[in-house]
Amino acid sequence: MRGLRSVIAVVGAAVCAGALAAPAWALAPSHANITFAAGSTVTETATGVTASAVLVWRQGASDVHGVGCCASDVVDAITGATLVEATPQSSFSFQWASDDARSFRVDSFDARGNYVGSAFTNAPTFVSNVGAPPDADATYAGAWSTQTTASALGGSLHFSTKKGASATFAGNVRTLAWITTVGPTHGSAQIFVDGHQVATVSTHAATVGFRRVKFARAWWGGPNDPVHTIRIVNAGTSGHSRVDVDGFLAVTED
């Protein structure tokens, strides 16, 4: 069974043929991305993994005509089916399997139905390609151990109980997410993104839960994904200092 650094191809930037030209201030092709739902559980299957994904997009200054803002249609770009019509939201949740090709188009309109732009994602599949240990592409510093358990992705995970122990994952990505374990002996971790601390995340819970997405970060950008880094640092929580690394999800451009 393969384990888990999941790599996901996503986010194209081609303009929809035949669409009306969008004003520069409106929703643009690069204004869509896919991230992962914090607190959700990643499921391992016979062919890979399934994760709770979220398509997100920017509405832009879509009410320049002063008629009211805004609504969006979410379209399956492969089948042409409209998945959500005239939603005032700027996100759409779905289950994403590693062998499932996904491609979306988001069309936005003002309150009178005037088209104000489209955004696109192109995600042929995401591929789980990590063997044991399931987070082999991460770099570890400090005291870490490996636990073998059928509940972990790929059958094993890394854990540390020492303050300052860290795990770093880097790549040319559009989105990064950390998968861990929660439980009564688990504590907090400091999250650094591209060298800057952005959050302190608790993995403490009354009962044990495996394969949890506890942090995700997505970036907006053009066609070339830069190198981004996520570093998980054990905060050394008194009385329950364990921090696990079961893997990472990384969205990359097609």
Q: What is the predicted function of each stretch?
A:
Residues 2-26:
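Secretory targeting and sorting signals
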Residues 26-75, 79-254:
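Glycan-recognition surfaces in beta-rich domains, encompassing non-catalytic CBMs
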